[in-house]
């Protein structure tokens, strides 16, 4: 009996030791576990679990890492990142970089992404790295971007009407970068996505949040974010160049290439077609451009601008209180992303000078250029001879966010960067007793048309100039067309169906 008891005792001891070994091999869950909607800070990161309904579990681990599981949900988001006070733009924060790794196992509709919001404007944004059964957002892409070592993303913009937001129920824009192929680990330059969006006209506001996020929609799944490092402020936007190099007044000067400013709010922003400009301008702000070479003289000024309010820009020489050369009056263009070129006459200026733009209120500026001839007819001499060459850049108004005045190699200027639907208006053209044809000097790579209309872009159609390819945008040819007999003083509008550069045009009394 004693022998049997000893055997049982030895067996029990072995079992206990085995259990201890097994327990010792199981990792202890050190993270905090939450099940329902909650926000807070953990491990130096801001976190949030949000759902409308369903079963959710989120375990908060060291630093930015976490794991999550979901089922029977409507919509659920699990995220860890950094929140801000909506008082700085991404440029003011500096470079934002996310380095991540995730064991991602969705069953149905889900995203693995960098996610966040901005205010003013209110924007919800996604940089989607991987997804489940459906690739978001189900819209037509605006373009693509490629990041070195990160791959290619398609860009989308969608609108949410009366939907939940960080400011309650609201209507707001959603911006999307969606990879063309899935991945679950890597490094994301968030700032580069923001820059590319703005260059496509997708304006960012003041930063509220950036977070690595797992989102599920009417699905189930689990994910283990084993790496999530968010670095902010490594490389703020550099100050503009202080280069003393002379700049040609008659070539386009990019607004963001200024030498100094008195503004604490001004920022370099993105503009359509991958451009840049300046914005967040306030009354009294000044921007200085050094060493502008006017040669024998300039008497005109044009700027490509966007604004939702009427405002004005003074053009001064050498200092913010220097000689007032002229004032550019800017009417609302309809939105901060709708750019138009506006022109004004200035007092003749020669030689090399610093130019200071003095602002009376908010406006976005893409670029500006000076001209040797006055772009606006002088008071008391407000008609133009239809039978003398009319420079294309001497328009009174234009429609088209990307239209630009540029210098020609042999001297003079022209208009270009024209797209379908753009138009330019030339006021007070004196046709006398009647013109029946028009000739334009143009350059284009592809066949296109220019409609000649009376009064407005939808006014009476006088005729259409059919333009064949000239071989390149630098090869100019004269092209003519017959128009309906036009007499007296009229406003003429050129309406474009596609890309073309226009140097000048002129009317004649006989058909061509």
Swiss-Prot record:
Its Gene Ontology molecular function terms? carbohydrate binding; endo-1,4-beta-xylanase activity; metal ion binding
The ranges of region (2 X 61 AA approximate repeats) come to 279-477
Write out the entry's keywords from A to Z.
Answer: Calcium, Carbohydrate metabolism, Cellulose degradation, Glycosidase, Hydrolase, Metal-binding, Polysaccharide degradation, Repeat, Signal, Xylan degradation
Pathway in which the depicted protein is active:
Glycan degradation; xylan degradation
The EC number on file is: 3.2.1.8
Question: Which parts of the sequence belong to the CBM6 domain?
Answer: 251-371, 388-508
Q: According to its UniProt record, which reaction does this protein catalyse?
A: Endohydrolysis of (1->4)-beta-D-xylosidic linkages in xylans
InterPro entries per the record? CBM6, Cellulose-bd_IV, ConA-like_dom_sf, Galactose-bd-like_sf, GH11/12, GH11_AS_1, GH11_AS_2, GH11_dom
Which GO BP annotation is one of this protein's?
cellulose catabolic process
Domain of life, source organism: Bacteria
Where do the annotations place D-xylotriose 1 binding?
Answer: 271, 280, 337, 364
Quote the record's binding site residues for D-xylotriose 2.
417, 474, 501
Q: Where is the active site?
A: 124 (nucleophile), 215 (proton donor)
Q: Where does D-xylobiose bind?
A: 280, 337, 364
GH11 domain location, by residue? Answer: 33-228
CDD domains reported in the protein's UniProt record: CBM6_xylanase-like
Checking Gene3D superfamilies in the record gives: 2.60.120.180, Galactose-binding domain-like (2.60.120.260)
Locate the residues binding Ca(2+) 1: 254, 256, 276, 366
| UniProt keyword annotation of Disulfide bond present | no
Q: State how activity varies with temperature.
A: Optimum temperature is 70 degrees Celsius. Thermostable.
Which residues are listed for Ca(2+) 2 binding in this entry? Answer: 391, 393, 413, 503
Per the record, the domain comment is:
XynA is a modular enzyme. The number of CBM6 (carbohydrate binding type-6) domains varies between strains. The polymeric substrate can interact with several of these CBM6 domains.
**Protein name in the entry:** Endo-1,4-beta-xylanase A
Species for this entry:
Thermoclostridium stercorarium (Clostridium stercorarium)
Lineage runs:
Bacteria, Bacillati, Bacillota, Clostridia, Eubacteriales
């Amino acid at each position: 009996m004693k022998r049997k008891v000893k055997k049982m005792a030895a067996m029990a001891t072995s079992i206990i030791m085995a259990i201890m070994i097994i327990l010792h091999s199981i990792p202890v869950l050190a993270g905090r576990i939450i099940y329902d909607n909650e926000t807070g800070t953990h491990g130096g990161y801001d976190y949030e679990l949000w759902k409308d309904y369903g079963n959710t579990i989120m375990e908060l681990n060291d630093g930015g890492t976490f794991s999550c599981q979901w089922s029977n949900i409507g919509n659920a988001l699990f995220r860890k990142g950094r929140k801000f006070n909506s008082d700085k733009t991404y440029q003011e924060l500096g470079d934002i970089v996310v380095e991540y790794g995730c064991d991602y196992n969705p069953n149905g509709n889900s995203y693995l992404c960098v996610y966040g919001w901005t205010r003013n404007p209110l924007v919800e944004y996604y940089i989607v790295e991987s997804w489940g059964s459906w690739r978001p957002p189900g819209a037509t892409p605006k373009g693509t971007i490629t990041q070195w070592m990160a791959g290619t993303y398609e860009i989308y913009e969608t609108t949410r009407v009366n939907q939940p937001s960080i400011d309650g129920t609201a209507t707001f824009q959603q911006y999307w970068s969606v990879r063309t192929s899935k991945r679950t680990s890597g490094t994301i330059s968030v700032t580069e996505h923001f820059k590319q969006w703005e260059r496509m006209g997708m304006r960012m506001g003041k930063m509220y949040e950036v977070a690595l996020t797992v989102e599920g929609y009417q699905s189930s799944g689990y994910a283990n974010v084993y790496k999530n490092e968010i670095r902010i402020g490594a490389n703020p936007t550099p100050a503009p160049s202080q280069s003393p190099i002379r700049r040609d007044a008659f070539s386009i000067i990019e607004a963001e290439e200024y030498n100094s400013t008195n503004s604490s709010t001004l920022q370099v922003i993105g503009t359509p077609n991958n451009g840049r400009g300046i914005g967040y301008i306030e009354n009294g702000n000044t921007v200085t451009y050094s060493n502008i070479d006017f040669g024998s003289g300039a008497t005109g000024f044009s700027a490509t601008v966007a604004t939702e309010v009427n405002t004005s820009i003074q053009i001064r020489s050498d200092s913010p209180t220097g000689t007032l050369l002229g004032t550019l009056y800017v009417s609302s263009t309809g939105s901060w992303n709708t750019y138009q070129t506006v022109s004004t006459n200035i007092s003749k200026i020669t030689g090399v000078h610093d130019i200071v733009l003095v602002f009376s209120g908010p406006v976005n500026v893409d670029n500006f250029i000076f001209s040797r001839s006055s772009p606006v007819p002088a008071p008391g001499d407000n008609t133009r001879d239809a039978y003398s060459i009319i420079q294309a850049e001497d328009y009174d108004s234009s429609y088209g966010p990307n239209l630009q005045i540029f210098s020609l190699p042999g001297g003079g200027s022209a208009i270009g960067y024209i797209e379908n639907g753009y138009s330019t208006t030339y006021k007070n053209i004196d046709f006398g007793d009647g013109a029946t044809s028009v000739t334009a000097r143009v350059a284009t790579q592809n066949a296109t048309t220019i409609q000649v209309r009376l009064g407005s872009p939808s006014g009476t159609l006088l005729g259409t100039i059919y333009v064949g390819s000239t071989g390149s945008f630098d090869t100019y040819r004269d092209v003519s067309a017959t128009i309906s007999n036009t007499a007296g003083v009229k406003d003429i509008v050129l309406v474009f169906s596609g890309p073309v550069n226009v140097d000048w045009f002129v009317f004649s009394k006989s058909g061509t």
